[in-house]
Design a protein with these regions (language model features):
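Coupling/switch/interface segments within P-loop NTPase motor domains and analogous charged loops
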Residues: 72-144
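Conserved P-loop NTPase-based nucleic-acid remodeling module centered on helicase motor cores
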Residues: 9-103, 224-227
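Conserved helicase NTPase motor core
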Residues: 13-15, 21-24, 41, 67-74, ...
Length: 227
């Protein structure tokens, strides 16, 4: 319908959450319209984020050739960062492991909640962990910046930051993405919802979701975003 109304494929942004959903979405679009899927801006939030950051990320100090860390590599970098700052922390039997800390940090970033609040929630109010874990998170972020690497959460967080801090980029997105279509919206978190809101200042958004299929609450997914 949008194509029939004269909207160019390259001005339609198609977003979804998982790689599987993205493949299915783009295949359906190509089958229904006869237009090659590559003519649209389409894919997961993370895929679109990395495309935009490689092209427009300079104001945030991001080089086009930055490397994306998979989950294992990101956890290893965090572990090495912790070891450099406080080797005894990881040796203590009762302290949370690097993988656990990575989950706390990721959850805070995706939900846009203060890391301190997440730490207290996960440790039943133990404030002893607040200062060191926040220090580890800051050092981890600096290590990524210095090495020009990004974890999956960076692809969203930096995209949002760029929309907020770079008016030229925000205007480009609003002009380029005249129509925004989001599938599997029940799996989006607050960070992704903020991205959609900042892109679609024209309010031309169609979102599809099913609350019974919301399975990523452990990563901050909120079906309420659709309202």
């Amino acid at each position: 319908w949008l194509l029939d109304q004269g909207v160019e494929p390259g001005r339609i942004l198609l977003l979804t959450f998982t790689n599987k959903a993205a493949r299915e979405m783009l295949a359906r679009v190509e089958s229904l319209t006869g237009v090659p899927a590559t003519a649209f801006w389409g894919g997961t939030f993370h895929h679109i984020g990395q495309r935009l950051l490689r092209r427009f990320g300079a104001p945030l100090g991001i080089e086009p050739g930055f490397t994306i860390l998979d989950q294992g590599d990101a956890e290893l970098l965090l572990q090495n960062t912790i070891r450099r700052l406080d080797a005894d922390f990881l040796k203590a039997k009762d302290n949370p492991k690097a993988k656990t800390l990575a989950n706390w940090i990721s959850y805070a970033r995706n939900t846009r909640e203060p890391l301190e609040d997440i730490i207290l929630e996960r440790t039943m109010g133990n404030r002893d962990y607040v200062e060191p874990v926040c220090e580890f998170a800051d050092a981890y972020r600096e290590a990524k910046r210095r090495q020009q690497v990004a974890d999956y959460d960076d692809l969203l967080e930096l995209w949002r930051d760029l929309l907020e801090k770079d008016a030229t980029f925000a205007e480009w997105c609003a002009d380029r993405f005249q129509e925004v279509l989001v599938d599997e919206y029940q799996d989006t978190n607050r960070l992704q919802s903020e991205i959609v809101d900042r892109i679609a200042t024209h309010h031309r958004v169609m979102a599809v979701g099913d609350d019974s299929q919301c399975i990523y609450t452990w990563r901050g997914a909120e079906f309420g975003n659709i309202t």
